[in-house]
C-alpha cells in the first residue's frame, strides 16, 4: 500500500448526507473478483444526471471529496472504498463516518478525515465559489488547508500510523515474517503448514 503523508488535489463539494455504500457503488457493480476497475460504478445512480458534481469540470478531476455527515453507512462493502480510490480520490472529509467504512478506508489507503460540520460548510463554500480550488491534506499534522484557511481533522493514532507507513493488513503481517517462520519451524510436522513458495506459486 502506498504511504500517505500529504496530498494536494482538487476538492469536490458533495452536499449530501447519509451517503450509504449502495449509493457509493450499487451492488450490480460488485460482480468481479479483482480489486480494481470499480470507478465506473462510483455514484452510478447519480452520475446519470449531467449536473451531478462529478460530471462537471473541474470537479471531475477531484481527489479530495468533502461530503455531508454519516458518510459510508449501510452494508459493509470494501468495494465502496475501492471505487472511491479507483476514481482518484485519496481523501474523504466529513463530520461523521460509519465505523466500518472508516476502518475499510484506513486499511486500503484512503484517508477518512473527520472535521466539524461547520468546517465542512466552510470548505463547501470555498470549493463552490472557487471551482478547481486545491485542498492540501497533511496527515502528519492532521490539517486540511485551502489557501489561507486551515482546519484540523481527527483520525485515530493507529490508522494514522498505518497510513503514514503504508501498511495494509498484508504489510502488517509481513513485518512479522521472521517470527512467523520461527513459529512454523517449531510446529510438529504432522500439523497443517503453508506450502513452500515454489509449490504455492506454481
Curated annotation (Swiss-Prot):
Keywords: Amino-acid biosynthesis, Branched-chain amino acid biosynthesis, Leucine biosynthesis, Lyase. Pfam families: Aconitase_C (PF00694). Pathway: Amino-acid biosynthesis; L-leucine biosynthesis; L-leucine from 3-methyl-2-oxobutanoate: step 2/4. It catalyses: (2R,3S)-3-isopropylmalate = (2S)-2-isopropylmalate. Its EC number is 4.2.1.33. Catalyzes the isomerization between 2-isopropylmalate and 3-isopropylmalate, via the formation of 2-isopropylmaleate. NCBIfam families: leuD (TIGR00171), PRK01641.1 (NF002458). Belongs to the LeuD family. LeuD type 1 subfamily. This is 3-isopropylmalate dehydratase small subunit. It comes from Rhodococcus erythropolis (strain PR4 / NBRC 100887).
Amino acid at each position: 500500500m502506498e504511504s500517505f503523508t500529504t496530498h494536494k488535489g482538487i476538492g469536490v463539494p458533495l452536499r449530501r448526507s447519509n451517503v450509504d455504500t449502495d449509493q457509493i457503488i450499487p451492488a450490480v457493480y460488485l460482480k468481479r473478483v479483482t480489486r480494481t476497475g470499480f470507478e465506473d460504478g462510483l455514484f452510478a445512480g447519480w452520475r446519470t444526471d449531467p449536473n451531478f458534481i462529478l460530471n462537471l469540470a473541474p470537479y471531475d478531476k477531484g481527489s479530495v471529496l468533502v461530503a455531508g455527515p454519516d458518510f459510508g453507512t449501510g452494508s459493509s462493502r470494501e468495494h465502496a472504498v475501492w471505487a472511491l480510490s479507483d476514481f482518484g480520490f485519496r481523501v474523504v472529509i466529513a463530520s461523521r463516518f460509519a465505523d466500518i467504512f472508516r476502518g475499510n478506508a484506513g486499511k486500503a489507503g484512503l484517508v477518512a478525515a473527520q472535521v466539524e460540520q461547520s468546517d465542512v460548510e466552510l470548505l463547501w463554500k470555498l470549493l463552490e465559489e472557487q471551482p478547481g480550488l486545491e485542498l492540501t491534506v497533511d496527515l502528519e499534522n492532521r490539517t486540511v488547508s485551502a489557501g489561507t484557511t486551515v482546519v484540523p481533522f481527527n483520525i485515530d493514532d493507529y490508522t494514522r500510523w498505518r497510513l503514514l507507513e503504508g501498511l495494509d493488513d498484508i504489510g502488517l503481517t509481513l513485518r512479522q515474517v521472521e517470527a512467523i517462520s520461527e513459529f512454523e519451524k517449531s510446529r510438529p510436522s504432522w500439523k497443517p503448514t503453508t506450502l513452500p513458495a515454489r509449490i504455492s506459486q506454481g
